[in-house]
Each structure stands twice: as C-alpha cells, then as structure tokens.
Amino acid sequence: MTLIKDMKVDQYFDGFYLIKSVELRQTRAGKDYLAMIFQDHSGTISGNLWDAQKSNIDNFQAGKVVHAEGKRELYNNMPQVNQIKLRLAMPLEPSDPSEYREKSPVKEQNLRDYIQSIVFKIENANWNRIVRHLLRKYDKEFYQFPAAKTNHHAFEGGLAYHETTMLKLAEKIVEVYPELNASLMFAGIILHDMAKVLEFTGFEDTAYTLKGNLIGHIVLIDEEVSKTVIELGLDENSEDILLLRHVLLSHHGKLDYGSPVRPQIKEAEMIHLIDMMDANMMMMSTALNTVQTGQQTARIWPLDNRNFYKASWEK
C-alpha cells in the first residue's frame, strides 16, 4: 500500500484510502465526473474519476474507504492522481474510516493536559470562569474538530492542536515582553477559535453549518462569551469582560479578514500575530510534505499565492 505522502510524480500506486470529499461535476461536453479528495493518515490528494456512471455516484461517497489504483501526476504544479480505478473496500479488508483520517500529531490526552495546565495560569477570576465554562460546554467537540475546512490544521483534533501551539508561543512571548497580560493572552487564545465547533459540521467531510455561513466563528464566540457572562452573573460592562471580547473580535487583525474591529491593545495584536504565525507554518509544512527535496510547492493562495522551496535539511 502506498501512503499519500510517499507517492512520487509519474509513478503508479495502489492502496486503500478514505474519500474525504466528493463532488459531482460536468465536463464542458456535459459528461459527469467525480472531483474527489482522497485521504490517509499521512495527508490528502485530489483526483477526478472521469465518465462517472450512476453506480459510481451512488457508491463513492464521502466517508467511504476505497481501493484505488492510478498514477500520481502534477497539474498546474498541484499533486493529483489520475487514471483512477476504484472499488469499495470489502468487509475483510481495512475498511474502518477512522484508520485513514489525518489526526493531530499530539494525542488528545496530552492536548487536554497541557491546555488544562494553562487554564490554571489564568489569574483573572472572570476570564478563568468563562474559559472553564466553555471548555466544559464544548469538551468533546473542542478536541475533535478541525481548525479549518481546508487551509490549516484541517484534520481531526486540529483545533486543539492549533490552540496548543499558539499557547506555547504565547508562553515564550510573555517572557520576552513581561508587560503583556499573560492571563488575557492565554484566555484569548483558548477561546479565539472555539466557535469553529459551531461553524463546522465536524471532522468528517467538513462543511460549513448555516450558522457558520451566515454568522461566522468570530461573532459566534462573542455570543458564547456574552451568554456565559450572563449565566455566571458577571458584569458585562467591566473592563476585563470588554477586553476579553475585544481580543476575540479582533483576532483576524483586519476588517478585510473578517474581524469587526482591529486590535487596539498589545495583547490583541499579539494574539493575531501568533494566530497568523501558526496557521502559516502549518500551511507551509503541509505543502512541503507533498514535494521532494529540491522541489518547490504549488502556489499557496492564502500565502500571497507563493511557492515554497524544500531545502536539503527538510525531511
């Protein structure tokens, strides 16, 4: 079985893979085909099943495990598989979808333990109570959901993994800049993307919910915090509550990026920069994992449509 990360350009492969997503499309000639994304625990790759028949459309659905044969190619410098032959995995074959999903490289319990250790460092009582309340409310989802649909940390457990990496960066930054309020940084980071559990449907065949499309996670987390403030009987007009809401509402940094306000305190600016840093690192790493040493990646649209080069010291 060929892992997706081990597929080489112009080489044939075969193996079992999960259909992460599938979309029925038509060619210019009006013929049906399936635009698919295949996945195993090492990564994802796209491919098209041409001249799709009704049986193909009925059988090859998201969440199904298939045996695939084909050729790994480049199209517009993007890796894809072509000349695909597919069949559904049989009962005695490795057909459990959970075996193929890309997951956080850190085990869930380790993520839980680390995040809980950071919660103990949130010294402001109001922020601490809000964080604990929402972590309890979305306990299961917070550690299972991805942080994004496609761009970064788009895998099972990606949300908590993203938060953990950001918290580790924040711990170092508050050492270098001791004037920063560490408690606000930690609370803001844990909460900033938590409403992704409301914005997305889950880690399998991830799609936007109606709330996600119409409202978005930035406004949704502000609503969650505001409701929590009322439930806990806190003063919604106190400075600490307003500052917590501010770092959450401003964490995308710019109005063009979806934040209704721009950062107006140091902690808000730092959370935005840490968020961007971790997301960008993940996008670069994901793209570089698809190419060999000495090659360049396909263009990464969220990173100003740039290519990145895989240097000799990278695995």
At which residue positions do the language-model features occur?
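OB-fold nucleic-acid-binding modules
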Residues: 1-13
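Structural detector for short beta-strands of small beta-barrel domains
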Residues: 11-28
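Divalent metal-coordination and catalytic microenvironments
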Residues: 17, 63, 166, 275
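OB-fold single-stranded nucleic acid-binding module
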Residues: 23-32, 45, 52-98
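Short, acidic/hydrophobic/Gly-rich beta-strand patch recurrent on exposed beta strands
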Residues: 35-40, 202
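Acidic/His-rich, divalent-metal-binding segments that scaffold phosphate/diphosphate chemistry
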Residues: 92-214, 238
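Divalent metal-dependent catalytic cores for phosphoryl transfer on phosphate-bearing substrates
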Residues: 151-152, 161, 172-293
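N-terminal intrinsically disordered, cationic/polar leader segments
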Residues: 272, 290, 294-307, 312-315
